[in-house]
């Protein structure tokens, strides 16, 4: 094939241009993302039971729905939480690769079976099924700058004019409103009701009857009488629209003709639909929307669409209303992609300089450089064909590929120049001869490197999704690189290179290059002599090799594991939790302290704080809160002390001084779709039906044990709410029936007075809003207030609650969790500084194994994926090595020669392990990819030597030692050149700082360390391996091998 293109260089150019055009068009169409869809798809079911406590919600809603979620395809795990605000959320997580739309349809179908079994109040509120991630893509804040709007006004405007439009935006999965829209609030006075012999049941019945839309039909409607001349709609009663109209609702007409109106027994106002959440932006009243990404949606496109939608609304905002973005994960995505692109450009420049140093000829250097855009653009075309995106992982693959893809072109150019210098042939003839020598090596290297990376593409789970990005990118680049080296590079060499006089190795050049060539030639002679000496005493070097292998094994076992490195994403969160029973007012004081700390003590780093009272990922309640903290640009906060990890550690230390509250600042996970916080995510499960109390005791025991290991664990905390005092009212049904009181009336009165009852809807400024009936605040603050409420008996007498009920205090949970259909408690935590999540997880497993019988555990979220990736890694290494061996065996038509190549692998691996250990990195997914790259590159250097030595023996009849020494002499320059090019190519990854540097350091460090040792050690050990293997498996002993040599050329 090379000879064909040497004679037809324009044909070669045409192919290269077509590849580049395809890549250019692909770049224009490829989506941009931080990561591909790594997180397994999730579907969330949300329901509400107004006024119900957590236990009631769990028993009547959560379990009913869970028990119907059987037989759904690819379901991985299911978690749920039920809280005392009457809210339930059930999240079903599916295996990676599952179609989220089909999963949603299946869940919806199963939910329909459960719907008739749910309480009427729940059905009335509606049950939603959304395919969205568990974490927020962004938080949009809305503030009033001129003080003309209250927080309730802002919230109502956001709910009425913004929430629905954002919910409809493509890519949005779910929208959480921080606040509530207006509702018609009927605040009942029990004393006035009793005075007029009325009950909440009477109030609700009257509102339903008098606030109704009546469809009254038409005058002259069809079928009309003959000759009808008029047709008109009849408008009768319509829904009420104002507090005055509601005040005039008639409750009762007395015998004397006097009337009792709603305003006589209740205070009526436009108020919040609920008062559970209070939001502030930098200390001033605000409202906002927490936006979650739909499963599989593109974060950058969705965020851009949201901003565009909001920009369209802004001209119509009331005076003083302003949008802020206190939490947005997408700037990090943009800048991290930008940083990797910058790294890619730096790598190309460094590789060019290395090539120029060795080739010392602009034309010769230009030939491998031309290969770079051809291969990179071609790789983009392949990515588009596979449906991939331009993301951090594919770009890392490109950076790793830079060093690999110029290798082939360098090998071609260097060998052509060597042939011209040694034999004095003209460029065209030298290229023909050169390609005959190295064509087999090029194909062999391509096969081996592909063999290393192809198995990655077949692994499952989130780890498999990450592996696939690297695999397809690097294998595509490698395949294109070999094609370019066989098609375009020979054509360029034949047409662009100038003839070199026979025997001219550049020693005669002046200046730096002359000195470099002389020194290199001298070093080559010394190196060849050293190898000759080593080959005379191979035994001691094999012992040294065994020591290296043992050291590698030791380092590998000792290297701590994790899933992905943490990143400074420019935003983080702070969780606030007060003791059980704490009020909203107390929580607000703590949130004010948190906000003040960030805006004063960290003012050089913090841009804004959006504090939300009553909301948290651990549950909702008056004693919970969360603060979304946005940091200034990465360029404005240089230094490790201004990174998010340092800021959160300082903040958590400072917040530990706050009495009566638990406050944690925490960073986001590397992949936000896999959770809300860094560290581990642990589920403690009641496997034996021990009950809530026993499970709580087990959880507290585990937390106490974890606290004894501050050297390994930090911030270990329950992701839930502590049990709180609950006021239990027991209804004596026998007494109630004896008094002639309806149980239904008792339940309605209790729910309406203390929990609030949704009655129906009204029209407010053209929008349908809800009507709620509830006791006025001052009549539901104390336990004794229950005695103010009456129920009408069958004989018309008013019976107080005290006549048929008793009350007591007991403890109960405001938030109940379940995991895979069993009661559970979620525990979050982090590894102590200097320790990995893998080590922390192992310790947690040890501590959990000592818990009482019947208490089990499981990992969820990012920790589940980490366990999965750790279990897959050994299989990945083993399969890759086996496939490499088989490819080499096929290439050399020998079972023995591949051993001389395979034995070099530990020499690269030990370098990767040393580099990671000295830098304090972990055995994460990026390191695993780097390790595989190191395996491939180590084998590549060995192939360059082994291929030449074997050819010299088979074709020129040279002896084993002579052929080996000639091979190492001839291949030293290209090995050093390609290795140095690769090392400097990944150097920008190693020294990267700022956005995305965690991932870049993780990828680059191991590969660079591995390449250094693979090069320095391999050039001495590969000759030893080749000689030892050839002696051990000589032809006469290789009965199972073929007796002929296959000519690769």
Curated annotation (Swiss-Prot):
Q: Mention any Pfam family matching this sequence.
A: ACR_tran
Entry's localization field = Cell inner membrane
Q: Which GO terms describe its cellular component?
A: efflux pump complex; membrane; periplasmic side of plasma membrane; plasma membrane
Annotated membrane-spanning segments are 10-28, 337-356, 366-385, 392-413, 439-457, 466-490, 539-555, 872-888, 899-918, 925-943, 973-992, 999-1018
Q: Does the keyword Cell membrane apply?
A: yes
Q: Which residues lie on this side of the membrane: Periplasmic?
A: 29-336, 386-391, 458-465, 556-871, 919-924, 993-998
The task this protein performs is described as:
AcrA-AcrB-AcrZ-TolC is a drug efflux protein complex with broad substrate specificity that uses the proton motive force to export substrates. (Microbial infection) Involved in contact-dependent growth inhibition (CDI), acts downstream of BamA, the receptor for CDI. Its role in CDI is independent of the AcrA-AcrB-TolC efflux pump complex.
Q: Indicate the quaternary assembly.
A: Homotrimer, with large domains that extend into the periplasm, interacts with AcrA and TolC. AcrA may be required to stably link this protein and TolC. Interacts with AcrZ. Part of the AcrA-AcrB-AcrZ-TolC efflux pump.
> Could you tell me what this protein is called?
Multidrug efflux pump subunit AcrB
Per the UniProt record, the source organism is: Escherichia coli (strain K12)
């Amino acid at each position: 094939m090379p000879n064909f293109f040497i004679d037809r260089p324009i044909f070669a150019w045409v192919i290269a241009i077509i590849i580049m055009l395809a890549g250019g068009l692909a770049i224009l169409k490829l989506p941009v993302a931080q990561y591909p869809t790594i997180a397994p798809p999730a579907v969330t079911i949300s329901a509400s039971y107004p006024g119900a406590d957590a236990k009631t919600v769990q028993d009547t809603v959560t379990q009913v729905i869970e028990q119907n979620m059987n037989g759904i395809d690819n379901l991985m795990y299911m978690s749920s939480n039920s809280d005392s605000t009457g809210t339930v959320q059930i999240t079903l997580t599916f295996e990676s690769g599952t179609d989220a739309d089909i999963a949603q349809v299946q869940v919806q179908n199963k939910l329909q079976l459960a719907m008739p079994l749910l309480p009427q109040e729940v059905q009335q509120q509606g049950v939603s099924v959304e395919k969205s991630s568990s974490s927020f893509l962004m938080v949009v804040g809305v503030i009033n700058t001129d003080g003309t709007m209250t927080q309730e006004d802002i919230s109502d405007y956001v709910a009425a004019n913004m929430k629905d439009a954002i919910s409809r935006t493509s890519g949005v999965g779910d929208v959480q409103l921080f606040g509530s829209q207006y509702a018609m609030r009927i605040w009942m006075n029990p004393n006035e009701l009793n005075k007029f012999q009325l009950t909440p049941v009477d109030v609700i019945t009257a509102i339903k009857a008098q606030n109704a839309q009546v469809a009254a039909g038409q005058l002259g409607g069809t079928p009309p009488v003959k000759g009808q001349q008029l047709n008109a709609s009849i408008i009768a009663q319509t829904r009420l629209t104002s507090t005055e109209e509601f005040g005039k609702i008639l409750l009762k007409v007395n015998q004397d003709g006097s009337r009792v109106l709603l305003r006589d027994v209740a205070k009526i106002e436009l108020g919040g639909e609920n008062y559970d959440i209070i939001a502030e932006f930098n200390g001033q009243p605000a409202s906002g929307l927490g936006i979650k990404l739909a499963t599989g949606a593109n974060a950058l496109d969705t965020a851009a669409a949201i901003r565009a939608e909001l920009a369209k609304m802004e001209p119509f905002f009331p005076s003083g209303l302003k949008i802020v973005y206190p939490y947005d994960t997408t700037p990090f995505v943009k800048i991290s992609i930008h940083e990797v692109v910058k790294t890619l450009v730096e790598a190309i420049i460094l590789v060019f300089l290395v090539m120029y140093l060795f080739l010392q000829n602009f034309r010769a250097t230009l030939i491998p450089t031309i290969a770079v855009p051809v291969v990179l653009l071609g790789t983009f075309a392949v990515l588009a064909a596979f449906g991939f995106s331009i993301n951090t992982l594919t770009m890392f693959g490109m950076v790793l590929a830079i060093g690999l893809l110029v290798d082939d072109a360098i090998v071609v150019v260097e060998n052509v120049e060597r042939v011209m210098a040694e034999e004095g042939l003209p460029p065209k003839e030298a290229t023909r001869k050169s390609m005959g020598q190295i064509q087999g090596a090029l194909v062999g290297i391509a096969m081996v490197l592909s063999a290393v990376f192809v198995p990655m593409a077949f692994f499952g789970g989130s780890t498999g999704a990450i592996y696939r990005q690297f695999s397809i990118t690097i294998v595509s680049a490698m395949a294109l690189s070999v094609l370019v080296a066989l098609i375009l590079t020979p054509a360029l060499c034949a047409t662009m290179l100038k003839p070199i006089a026979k025997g001219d190795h550049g020693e005669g050049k002046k200046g730096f290059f002359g000195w470099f060539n002389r020194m290199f030639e001298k070093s080559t002679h010394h190196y060849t002599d050293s190898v000759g000496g080593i080959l005379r005493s191979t035994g001691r070097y094999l012992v040294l090799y065994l020591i290296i292998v043992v050291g590698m094994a030791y380092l590998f076992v000792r290297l701590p594991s994790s899933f992905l490195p943490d990143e400074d994403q420019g935003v983080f969160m702070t969780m606030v939790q007060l003791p059980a029973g704490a009020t909203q007012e107390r929580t607000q004081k703590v949130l004010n302290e948190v906000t003040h700390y960030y805006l004063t003590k960290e003012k050089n780093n913090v841009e804004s704080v959006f504090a939300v009272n009553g909301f948290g990922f651990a549950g909702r309640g008056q004693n919970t809160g969360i603060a979304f903290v946005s940091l200034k640009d990465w360029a404005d906060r240089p230094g490790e002390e201004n990174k998010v990890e340092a800021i959160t550690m300082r903040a958590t230390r400072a917040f530990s001084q706050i009495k009566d509250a638990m406050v944690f600042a925490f960073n986001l996970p590397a992949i936000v779709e896999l959770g809300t916080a860094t560290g581990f995510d642990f589920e403690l499960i009641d496997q034996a039906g021990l009950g809530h109390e026993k499970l709580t005791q087990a959880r507290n025991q585990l937390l106490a044990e974890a606290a004894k290991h501050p050297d390994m664990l930090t911030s270990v905390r329950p992701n839930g709410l502590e049990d709180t005092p609950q006021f239990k009212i027991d209804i004596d049904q026998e007494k109630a029936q004896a008094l002639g009181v309806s149980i239904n009336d008792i339940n309605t009165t209790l729910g309406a007075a203390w929990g609030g009852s949704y009655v129906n809807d009204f029209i407010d400024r053209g929008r349908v809003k809800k009507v709620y009936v509830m006791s006025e605040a001052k009549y539901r603050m104390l336990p004794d207030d229950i005695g103010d409420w009456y129920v009408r008996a069958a004989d018309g007498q008013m019976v107080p609650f005290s006549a048929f009920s008793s009350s007591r205090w007991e403890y109960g949970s405001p938030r109940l969790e379940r995991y895979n259909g069993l009661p559970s408690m979620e525990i979050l935590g982090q590894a102590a500084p200097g320790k990995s999540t893998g080590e922390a997880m192992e310790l947690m497993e040890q501590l959990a194994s000592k818990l009482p019988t019947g208490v089990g555990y499981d990992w969820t979220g990012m920790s589940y994926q980490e366990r999965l990736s750790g279990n897959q890694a050994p299989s990945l290494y083993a399969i890759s090595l086996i496939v490499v061996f088989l490819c080499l065996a096929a290439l050399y038509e020998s079972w023995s020669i591949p051993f001389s190549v395979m034995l070099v692998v530990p020499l690269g691996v030990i370098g990767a392990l040393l580099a990671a250990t000295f830098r304090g990195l972990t055995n994460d997914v990026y390191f695993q990819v780097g390790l595989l790259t190191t395996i491939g590159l180590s084998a590549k250097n060995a192939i360059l030597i082994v291929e030449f030595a074997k050819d010299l023996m088979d074709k020129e009849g040279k002896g084993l030692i002579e052929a080996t020494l000639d091979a190492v002499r001839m291949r030293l320059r290209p090995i050093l050149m390609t290795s140095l090019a690769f090392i400097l190519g990944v150097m920008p990854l190693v020294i990267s700082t700022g956005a995305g540097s965690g991932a870049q350091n993780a990828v680059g460090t191991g590969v660079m360390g591995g390449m250094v040792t693979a090069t320095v050690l391999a050039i001495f050990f590969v000759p030893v391996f080749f000689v030892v293997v050839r002696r051990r498996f000589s032809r006469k002993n290789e009965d199972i091998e073929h007796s002929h040599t296959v000519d690769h050329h």
